[in-house]
């Protein structure tokens, strides 16, 4: 029987190295995906996840088990990504890699690939706040409520951000005469 992540987190917060190892094995890929979609650069995402892995044992003592561990972890990753972007002043290049995974998966279909490339470029032009919201709602398929919990926002704020994303993407497409 598998131990729930919340229980593992509480155990790891109390210094249990085996619980910490199990948490990393279970959630490393999730941390990387969120970091990559938030930062857009493979090297930045790898560095960020390594930093998080180093600081996570200390941070786990603040996890109280009131929410799902995954929601708490999303917030840790998003906040660490924000800190890194502020520290590096890299907001202009923060999403260069958005959509690379999707582009690679659809390389066989030229028309789809062209549309995906356009979307990746358009995503890179969104504000970091909108990108991180899209990364959770579309990339991680979270509900607006769950994304709000992870970002420290209300469900309504997440819905508003997603509405803004649609509006900005539509405007970009119209500006580039992609919509007829």
Task: Annotate the PLM regions.
Residues 11, 93-96, 121, 149-152, ...:
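C-terminal edge and immediately downstream basic/flexible tail or linker adjoining helix-turn-helix-like DNA-binding
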Residues 64, 86-89, 126, 131, ...:
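Short, Lys/Arg-enriched C-terminal cap helix and immediately downstream tail that follows
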């Amino acid at each position: 029987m598998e131990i729930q992540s919340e229980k593992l987190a509480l155990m790891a917060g109390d210094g249990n190295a085996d619980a910490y190892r199990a948490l990393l094995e279970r959630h490393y890929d999730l941390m990387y995906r969120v970091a990559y979609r938030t930062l857009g650069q493979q090297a930045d995402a790898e560095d960020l996840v390594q930093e998080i892995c180093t600081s996570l044992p200390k941070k786990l003592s603040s996890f109280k088990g009131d929410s799902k561990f995954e929601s708490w972890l999303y917030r840790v990753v998003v906040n660490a990504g924000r800190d890194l972007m502020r520290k590096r002043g890299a907001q202009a290049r923060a999403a260069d890699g958005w959509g690379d995974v999707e582009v690679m998966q659809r390389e066989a279909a030229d028309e789809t690939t062209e549309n995906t490339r356009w979307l990746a470029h358009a995503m890179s032009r969104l504000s970091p706040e909108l990108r991180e919201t899209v990364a959770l709602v579309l990339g991680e398929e979270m509900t607006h409520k769950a994304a709000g919990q992870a970002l420290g926002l209300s469900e309504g704020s997440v819905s508003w951000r997603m509405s803004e994303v649609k509006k900005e993407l539509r405007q970009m497409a119209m500006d580039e005469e992609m919509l007829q």
